[in-house]
Amino acid sequence: MKKIFVLVLALSAVQAFAQTPEELDRDRSKYATYSFSKDDKYKVETPYETVTVKQPKGKKVKNVIFMIGDGTGLNQWSVGYVANGGKLNVLQMPVAGYSQTNATDRLVTDSPAGGAALATGVKTKYGYIALDPEGNPVESNLQWGKRVKGMKTGVTVTCRINDATPADFCVHGPSRKDEEGLAAQYVDANVDFISGGGTHFWDQRSDGRNLIEEMKAKGYTYVDKVEDIALAEGDKFLGLYDEYDLKPYLDRGPVLMESTLKAIQMLDNKKGFFLMVEGSQVDDWCHRNKVGYMCEELFDFDRVIGEVLKWAEKDGQTLVVVTADHNTGGLSLLKGSIEEREVKVKFSTSGHDGLFVPVFAYGPGAEAFAGVHDNAEIGQIVRKLMSK
């Protein structure tokens, strides 16, 4: 019976993913090749260039850009480092530490509990979205910034916007499975910039509501095509580009880059802003044990990190934090070559694992993230720096 239950869960998870592209689509990559018959190997033909930034002199945090690589541990970054020829934008961040990710009731956490600790500074149970262990809603740093500081706020992801990690910053709930309920909470969440996938839970609902129309009635500019992101005007933005998750990187293009830059443009103001950016699908492809797809998602996320760092350097008052909610796949780097930009790996699980994950920081207060912290402490440090 247990085996049947696990199989049903696995099939449900696969159906939630975007459709896997055809092999020919994958071969059109401008920077990489990928062997579909060998999911444990990957080679980059043309690496991307990384940025160089200096630590700003400002000491006060006006803006926070909190970046989460879902399922992205030191293992994934190590593989990406080798595959891109020994270069990553995230390594330009001057401060590094570690975060332990366990939930209150399980050693190996999930995205709801892992994300909730980062978002709120409160450690919680497996499966809970921005609730404390007793089931009470806990205010996230994004929500606190809006309420107390008058900051503008935003989330941009490549998964469903009502999936666990973005939900942890914007809404509350006892289960990630209630995606219609989580989506409905966004109508009154007053988040200024929302970008991702998941239209199925917004306008094809069992209760007949059309949340997209409700958001438009509240003054949101709605965008459903990636090419229209840069053209959007107004003070509030809702972008939903797919029925479920967005497609894998080589098929969707630089959506995360475009949406992140648009978010910064729209949110930047005298009172500051809080923006959460998630590289959502590193986790998905580690669950599937496909290192090539994983690297494509990691590189997409890292290129966004580079542009964020360039903007933060000019601004001088922006704290940038890059971390993960948990590690996925039990990934090991077995062989490879930095010079040849190729890797051979092994996954030990299709699930999460309990390893510490890295924390990188740049900007005012970055030094506070050095060392080893509980994941809830990461959220607490962010709140403390925002409070000064």
What do the predicted segments below correspond to?
Residues 1-21:
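Bacterial Sec-dependent N-terminal signal peptides
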Residues 221-223, 252-267:
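A Trp-anchored, charged/polar loop motif used as the substrate-binding/catalytic surface
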Residues 163-170, 243-246, 260, 268-272, ...:
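Active-site His/acidic residue clusters
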Residues 235, 270-274, 317, 326, ...:
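Active-site lining segments that contact anionic ligands and/or coordinate catalytic metals
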Residues 19-198, 203-204, 211-222, 226-229, ...:
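N-terminal catalytic scaffold of extracellular/periplasmic and nuclease hydrolases
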Residues 74, 299-338:
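Metal-dependent active-site segment of extracytoplasmic phospho-/sulfohydrolases and closely related
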Residues 121-126, 238-248, 283-288, 360-364:
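Gly-rich Lys/Arg/Thr-decorated short loops/hinges at beta-loop-alpha junctions or inter-strand turns
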Residues 66, 239-241, 274-278, 321:
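Structural motif
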